């Protein structure tokens, strides 16, 4: 899961995972 932040999406491009 990724943190609930704008621009953060589940996937290889999620910087807050």
Swiss-Prot record:
Expressed in which tissues: Expressed by the venom duct.
Protein's name in the database: Conotoxin Reg12h
Family that this chain belongs to: Belongs to the conotoxin M superfamily.
Any single GO CC term annotated in Swiss-Prot or TrEMBL for this entry: extracellular region
Species this protein is from: Conus regius
UniProt domain comment: The cysteine framework is III (CC-C-C-CC).
Localisation: Secreted
Recorded GO MF terms: toxin activity
Residue intervals passing through the bilayer: none
Keywords: Disulfide bond, Secreted, Toxin
